[in-house]
Swiss-Prot record:
Classification of source organism: Eukaryota, Fungi, Fungi incertae sedis, Microsporidia, Nosematidae
Protein name stated in the entry: General transcription and DNA repair factor IIH helicase/translocase subunit XPB
Transmembrane segments: none
Subunit structure: Component of the 7-subunit TFIIH core complex composed of XPB/SSL2, XPD/RAD3, SSL1, TFB1, TFB2, TFB4 and TFB5, which is active in NER. The core complex associates with the 3-subunit CTD-kinase module TFIIK composed of CCL1, KIN28 and TFB3 to form the 10-subunit holoenzyme (holo-TFIIH) active in transcription.
Localization: Nucleus
Keyword terms, alphabetized: ATP-binding, DNA damage, DNA repair, DNA-binding, Helicase, Hydrolase, Isomerase, Nucleotide-binding, Nucleus, Transcription, Transcription regulation
Location of the Helicase ATP-binding domain: 215-377
Cross-referenced PANTHER family: GENERAL TRANSCRIPTION AND DNA REPAIR FACTOR IIH HELICASE SUBUNIT XPB, RAD25/XP-B DNA REPAIR HELICASE
Binding of ATP, residues: 228-235
Organism per entry: Vairimorpha ceranae (strain BRL01) (Microsporidian parasite)
UniProt similarity note: Belongs to the helicase family. RAD25/XPB subfamily.
Gene that this polypeptide is encoded by: SSL2
Function: ATP-dependent 3'-5' DNA helicase/translocase; binds dsDNA rather than ssDNA, unzipping it in a translocase rather than classical helicase activity. Component of the general transcription and DNA repair factor IIH (TFIIH) core complex. When complexed to CDK-activating kinase (CAK), involved in RNA transcription by RNA polymerase II. Also involved in transcription-coupled nucleotide excision repair (NER) of damaged DNA. In NER, TFIIH acts by opening DNA around the lesion to allow the excision of the damaged oligonucleotide and its replacement by a new DNA fragment.
């Protein structure tokens, strides 16, 4: 995040070491405030739940295991706090009330510096015009006295209308008064409203209601981001938001499968007719029949800047000429700033809502979302939702698979790409995967096996006789396989590439096995765990789901595995290490049992071409024919520093096709 977005004093703030002074009755309180704005919460104290709810509003969660939580107060978290109505005095007094120690002077000064000007002026959209609301006349006078702002305002006795919104927003940041955007949708008589409500059978959970209360206040809608674990009902939160605003809504997803699921869920939970909820994908080019409705599309469809078919261009023109009440952004964490700026500039909208499970990236671009979309409105505690039965309880395992001598000998001398495939195709890992599938199918589980490597995905699935989905799999075939997995008692295991990482709803799945992954991506690890958190049987007594990550011993996989697990460990999950599975060797019919079979497998790996070594990201890139920069952005890999690749550019050799 560019520091120009921060108050000038906050940019220069230092945190000198200070002595922690305990209160006389400190044992009655639940949190410690360190001199560097780190807060440690003891969850076993009597008032810890109230303290935790407050900390979520003013600080970033760092780590939340069972008994001790860590939070960090940042300029961005304080921006979010004042955006939802907390004042400087509210923050200071409540923090002091829960604290065991006297608040360090540097922390108090930092809070004051960050919140003194934040939240004091609002940009309100009323009657299709932009107005400024100030906390008091002194602040309003300061704005009007600024020459740049004054030249872009239309001031009357009753209101201050903004003429050039972007210029005023930029100038307000420069003078330490960033604008908070609110949409007065109830008084918007210019945009058409349409009849859409939740069905009487649709039930909203308490934490979902809390999310929505943060977004809607005094009859207005705030732009911002809501963070909920996979499987906890992010989609329903978005659907409830659009039924509250009741204006035309544009929903952006990461994939065509996600588009279908958003459409199905919206029709399931609301009374909308199928004619007014439409899709814009490479397969469907639809528009609603009434004056307003819902369009669901993907980020890449909207950001694509090549030549479109006449039918697609017609829909794109309609999207750009429509004024949208709500822009709903699913899986908001995976799309970097450049794509968001493009998407946001393409469409006229009044309110933005971002939904995500993991507000984390391996680069430093996640903070861009604070100002491109809005502040974080709410973030849930995974373990709290698990304890209440809203998401499933999970047992996580890291399974170490020893490399055979021949495979490891080649591993030590091959290129980085071949090394990676050798560690994935390790015969011991094959056997471990086969054993775990057999064991869990016998228990009645539905199993998802993930592999980033397309070559390994096909090899495992074909060898074990299981269906698989990856980039080139057609949309119809994808939906057919997923339907069979959900309903057919004979189809209990499917293999997925990284196309299944996000937005695939499979509540039947109760076991996940990961045979390869994207290096050290914490986000991907959490997203994959999320595929089994929504298990239908989660409320059954003693029911648990299982997450296995198979890694080849003494390879780079072990190094990346610890990095990947960090986010989940911070959410309170623990990984049990399985160093060996002796039961594997009791199966006389196990795959690649003999030396000759293992040698054949090794030869096939060594003879693999560069094309076969590609991950599914690259395969998808060629399949849909978009610029590499767009696709890397939409998958969240842009800027990550975990890859070592050969110098090559196959993309330039491929022609792009029309969308």
């Amino acid at each position: 995040m560019n520091n120009v977005m921060l108050p000038k004093k906050a940019q220069k703030h230092q945190f000198p070491v200070e002595e922690i002074i305990l209160k006389d009755d400190h044992e009655n309180f639940s949190l410690w405030i360190n001199y560097d704005a780190l807060i440690i919460l003891e969850t076993f104290k009597q008032n810890s739940k109230q303290a935790s709810d407050f900390l979520i509003a003013i600080a970033e969660p760092v780590s939340r295991p069972k008994y001790i939580h860590e939070y960090q107060i940042t300029a961005y978290s304080l921006y979010a706090a004042v955006s939802v109505g907390l004042s400087t005095d509210d923050i200071l007094s409540t923090l002091s009330y829960f604290s065991k120690n006297i608040m360090p002077r540097s922390v108090k000064n930092f809070i004051v510096e960050c919140t003194l000007s934040y939240g004091k002026i609002k940009l309100v959209i009323q009657f299709n015009k932009y107005f400024i609301e100030a906390a008091n006349n002194d602040i309003l006078k300061k704005l009007i006295d600024d020459k740049i702002i004054r030249s872009n305002l239309f001031v009357t006795d009753n209101s201050v209308e903004v003429i050039n919104v972007e210029l005023v927003k930029k100038r307000c940041i420069e003078i330490d008064y960033p604008l908070i955007e609110e949409y007065d949708f109830k008084n918007d008589t210019v945009l058409e409203s349409f009849f859409i409500d939740l069905k009487p059978s649709t039930m909203i959970r308490s934490y979902q209601e809390t999310c929505l209360n943060k977004m809607f206040c005094n009859g207005r809608a705030r732009s911002g981001i809501i963070v909920l674990p996979c499987g906890s009902g992010k989609t329903l939160v978005g659907i409830t938001a659009l039924t509250t605003i009741k204006k035309s809504c544009l929903i952006l997803c990461t994939s065509a499968v996600s588009v279908e699921q958003w459409r199905q869920q919206t029709m399931l939970f609301t009374n909308i007719s199928g004619d007014n909820i439409c899709r814009f994908t490479s397969e469907y080019k639809e528009w609603y029949k009434d004056k307003c409705g819902i369009i669901i599309t993907t980020y890449t469809m909207l950001a694509y800047n090549g030549k479109r078919s006449p039918e697609a261009q017609k829909i794109m023109d309609l999207i750009q000429s429509t004024e949208w009440g709500l822009l709903l952004l699913d899986e908001v964490h995976v799309v970097p700033a450049m794509m968001f700026r493009k998407v946001i500039s393409l469409v006229t909208h009044h309110c933005k809502l971002g939904l995500t499970a993991t507000l984390v990236r391996e680069d430093d671009k996640i903070e861009d979302l604070n100002f491109l979309i809005g502040p974080k409105l709410y973030e849930a505690d995974w373990q709290d939702l698990s304890a209440k039965g809203h998401i499933a309880k999970v047992e996580c395992f890291e399974v170490w698979c020893g490399m055979t001598g021949e495979f490891y000998k080649e591993y030590l001398i091959q290129t980085s790409r071949k090394k990676r495939l050798l560690s994935i195709m390790n015969p011991t890992k094959f056997q471990a995967c086969e054993y775990l599938i057999s064991r869990h199918e016998a228990k009645g589980d539905k199993i998802i096996v993930f592999s980033d490597s397309v070559a390994a995905l096909k090899s495992y699935a074909l060898k074990l006789g299981k269906p698989f989905i990856y980039g080139p799999t057609g949309q119809t075939e994808r939906m057919r396989i997923l339907k069979q997995f959900q309903t057919n008692p004979l189809i209990n295991t499917i293999f997925l590439s990284k196309v299944g990482d996000t937005s695939i709803d499979l509540p039947e799945a109760t076991c996940l096995i990961q045979i390869s992954s994207h290096f050290g991506s914490r986000r991907q690890e959490a997203q994959r765990l999320g595929r089994i958190l929504r298990a239908k049987r989660r409320n059954d007594p003693d029911f648990k789901v299982f997450f296995y990550s198979l890694v080849s011993k003494d390879t780079d996989e072990m190094f990346y595995s610890s990095k990947r697990q960090q986010f989940l460990v911070d959410q309170g999950y623990s990984f049990n290490i399985i160093t060996e599975i002796p039961e594997i060797y009791k199966n006389e019919n196990r795959v690649y049992k003999s030396k000759s079979q293992q040698k054949e497998l090794l030869v096939s790996v060594l003879l693999s071409s560069d094309k076969e070594l590609e991950s599914d990201t690259e395969a998808d890139n060629e399949e849909i024919g978009v610029y590499s920069g767009i696709l890397k952005g939409s998958t969240g890999v842009d800027g990550m520093a975990y890859m070592e690749t050969n110098e090559r550019n196959d993309l330039g050799k491929n022609k792009r096709r029309r969308k």
